[in-house]
From Swiss-Prot:
Residues annotated for substrate binding in this entry: 298-303
Quaternary structure and interacting proteins, as annotated: Interacts with chaperones HSP70 and HSP90; this interaction is required for initial targeting to mitochondria.
EC number: 1.14.14.1, 1.14.13.n7
Cofactor(s) listed: heme
Gene from which this protein is expressed: CYP2E1
Residues annotated as binding heme: 437
Keyword DNA damage: no
The protein's annotated pathway: Lipid metabolism; fatty acid metabolism
Keyword Thylakoid annotated: no
Protein keywords: Endoplasmic reticulum, Fatty acid metabolism, Heme, Iron, Lipid metabolism, Membrane, Metal-binding, Microsome, Mitochondrion, Mitochondrion inner membrane, Monooxygenase, NADP, Oxidoreductase
Pfam families assigned: p450
Any one GO MF annotation of this record: Hsp70 protein binding
The protein's name: Cytochrome P450 2E1
Enzyme's top EC category: oxidoreductase
Length: 495
């Protein structure tokens, strides 16, 4: 019996050595960047803190260098860390690394839309979306007027709080939601509209779930975990509900479409779909249009909403910054004129604060996953087609050489010695290259105008002592999620 046990142990030992030998051969068959040795099935899971994966990337970069290989389960990934290599990936190799790595939580969006899509469908849909959004006012006066109009409605709702504590999540968030809704549907909604509040709740919950430890695990092992109970089921259900809403809106617009008078982005896509009605391989299908609308609605609402909400919390933490903003707003805009984009040139401090909020919160620390579209030689390494590429934005936004004391909130990071706004090429909050955020211009405009409007009319009042405000995110994964809080808005006396 003892001999049998020894024999079994030897067989297991030999099988393990053989498996490791084969694994090493596969691992070293390409000139991959260095990295920790992966274990079967789980890959490098043990080297990652699933509660703070970006921090794990920083630690591994210190050991293996700015470009290193990891296995997320069985998925090979190359992590790129630091300003120069990240810029090279996003700009110098923008075609080679323009693919989108898979996100299991959005599998039903695969091959459609503009966020989680790949290939020719993505390129054509993105190109059309950029052109149409630009024509509808993306970055032009049309969007400025949209935001100014929405700021008026937002201020009305904020005045009704009458200085009492309230949660700003869906109040402040309704402004960017209405701006993108007007672009997509040529329609804005009342701040009490239940369908809109439901959608915003889904966006908010999804952003949190995508950043939770369980979803980090699920993304790496979807084939094993999909049958188990867990928050991935809630995420998938939410994504399905948002997509169903978008499809319903598409069908409603299709019924009432007037090709000679398109009402917005959605109508323009439907007109293109009609042109393809005899095509054997149409691009503008109901599915693709619905997912594109869902992508734009989610991205156009949640990222700006979260940034504004985080920004207000930061300003309550640093009342001296808020005081300087009030002084600049009073001097340049005054108490009653609507803030305008042209004011940015005369308001370097607010411009710097808006940039510093985005840099400091580092909303998408690891960017969205990229993917190699072909075998690529990068910095002497061979990165095979299909490899996930992770250009870490936090390593650029928190570069100590560019931003002294990057862990601190300092608007001076974007001001020169004369107090003028100082642009930094390290500011990559919207990513860059082929996968840069399509709404970057709109988001920049919204953040500046909405923050200016709020501070023009209100003082921010925290329910706790400013020094006790904790700015730490409650979850770090896909994004950094700010803590929930309440605040009071005290009307400012007219000057």
């Amino acid at each position: 019996m003892a001999a049998l046990g020894i024999t079994v142990a030897l067989l297991v030992w030999m099988a393990t050595l053989l498996f490791i030998s084969i694994w090493k051969h596969i691992y070293s068959s390409w000139k991959l960047p260095p990295g920790p040795f992966p274990l079967p099935i789980i890959g490098n899971l043990l080297q990652l803190d699933i509660k703070n994966i970006p921090k794990s990337f920083t630690r591994l970069a210190e050991r293996y260098g700015p470009v290193f290989t990891l296995y997320l389960g069985s998925q090979r990934a190359v992590v790129v860390h630091g300003y120069k290599p990240v810029k090279e990936v996003l700009l110098d190799y923008k075609n080679e690394f323009s693919g989108r790595g898979e996100n299991p939580g959005f599998q039903m969006h695969k091959n459609n839309g503009i966020i989680f899509n790949n290939g020719s469908t993505w390129r054509d849909t993105r190109r059309f979306s950029l052109t149409t959004l630009r024509d509808l006012g993306m970055g032009k006066q049309g969007n400025e007027q949209r935001i100014q109009r929405e700021a008026h409605f937002l201020l009305e709702v904020l005045r009704k709080t009458q200085g009492q504590p309230f949660d700003p999540t869906f109040v402040v968030g309704f402004a960017p939601y209405n701006v993108i809704s007007d672009i997509l549907f040529h329609k804005r909604f009342d701040y009490k509209d239940q369908t809109s509040l439901r959608l915003m709740s889904l966006f908010n919950e999804n952003f949190y779930l995508l950043s939770s430890p369980w979803i980090q695990l699920y993304n790496n092992f979807p084939d094993y975990l999909q049958y188990l109970p867990g928050s991935h089921r809630k995420l998938l259900k939410n994504v399905s509900e948002v997509k169903s809403y978008a499809l319903e809106r598409v069908k409603d617009h299709q019924k009432s479409l007037e090709p000679s008078c398109p009402r917005g982005f959605l109508d323009t896509m439907l007109i293109e779909m009609a042109k393809e009605r005899h095509s054997v391989d149409p691009m503008y299908t109901l599915e693709n249009i619905a997912v594109t609308v869902a992508d734009l609605l989610f991205a156009g609402t949640e990222t700006t909403s979260t940034t504004l909400r985080y920004g207000l919390l930061i300003l309550m933490k640093y009342p001296e910054v808020e005081e300087k903003l009030h002084e600049e707003i009073d001097r340049v805009i005054g108490p009653s004129r609507i803030p305008a984009v042209k004011d940015r040139l005369d308001m370097p401090y607010l411009d710097a604060v808006v940039h510093e909020i985005q840099r400091f919160i580092d909303l998408l620390p690891s960017n969205l996953l990229h993917e190699a579209t072909q075998d690529t030689v990068f910095r002497g390494y061979v990165i095979p087609k299909g490899t996930v590429v992770i250009p870490t934005l936090d390593s650029v936004l928190h570069d100590r050489q560019e931003f002294p004391e990057p862990e601190k909130f300092k608007p001076e990071h974007f001001l020169n010695e004369n107090g003028k706004f100082k642009y930094s090429d390290h500011f990559k909050a919207f990513s860059a290259g082929k996968r840069v955020c399509v709404g970057e211009g709109l988001a920049r405009m919204e953040l500046f105008l909405l923050l200016a409007a709020i501070l023009q009319h209100f003082n921010l009042k925290s329910l706790v002592d400013p020094k006790d405000i904790d700015l730490s995110p409650i979850a770090i994964g896909f994004g950094k999620i700010p803590p929930r809080y309440k605040l009071c808005l005290i009307p400012r006396s007219k000057v």
